[in-house]
Amino acid sequence: MTSFAQLDIKSEELAIVKTILQQLVPDYTVWAFGSRVKGKAKKYSDLDLAIISEEPLDFLARDRLKEAFSESDLPWRVDLLDWATTSEDFREIIRKVYVVIQEKEKTVEKPTAL
């Protein structure tokens, strides 16, 4: 895993990405991978995001994410990858170099009264 310092996007772009993810998929961990993490991005290279979950992302959530990213002020495209439907071979490639963009929200249960 790498750090945010190695993610090749501007801080204001990262803020947009994180806001969209937090609003639409707060219960998922999200990793960036690909050229923007490996230091091989060109000016308009896309941002590859893996939505990490054991269950496939539902179509409505995926469509909302795609729409939010396409309507945002980001100067490049965001490609979404559903971890649950990704082959183990490709998962291994991603695991070599990625950046955590969002951690799954932890729900805190209230203690029950005795």
Curated annotation (Swiss-Prot):
Enzyme class, broadest EC rank: transferase
Database matches in Gene3D superfamilies: Beta Polymerase, domain 2 (3.30.460.10)
Chain residues that bind Mg(2+) 1: D46, D48, E67, E71
Job of this protein: Probable antitoxin component of a type VII toxin-antitoxin (TA) system. Neutralizes cognate toxic HEPN probably by di-AMPylation. A mixture of HepT and MntA binds nucleotides; the highest affinity is for TTP, ATP binds more tightly than ADP or AMP.
Alphabetical UniProt keywords: ATP-binding, Magnesium, Metal-binding, Nucleotide-binding, Nucleotidyltransferase, Toxin-antitoxin system, Transferase
Active site: D46, D48
Pfam annotation, one family: NTP_transf_2
Source domain of life: Bacteria
Name of the molecule in the record: Probable protein adenylyltransferase MntA
Binding note for cofactor: Binds 2 divalent metal cations, probably Mg(2+) in vivo, Zn(2+) ions are found in the crystal structure.
Organism: Haemophilus influenzae (strain ATCC 51907 / DSM 11121 / KW20 / Rd)
Reaction equation(s) it catalyzes: L-tyrosyl-[protein] + ATP = O-(5'-adenylyl)-L-tyrosyl-[protein] + diphosphate; O-(5'-adenylyl)-L-tyrosyl-[protein] + ATP = O-[5'-(adenylyl-(5'->3')-adenylyl)]-L-tyrosyl-[protein] + diphosphate
Oligomer and partners: Forms a complex with HepT, probably with a stoichiometry of 2:2.
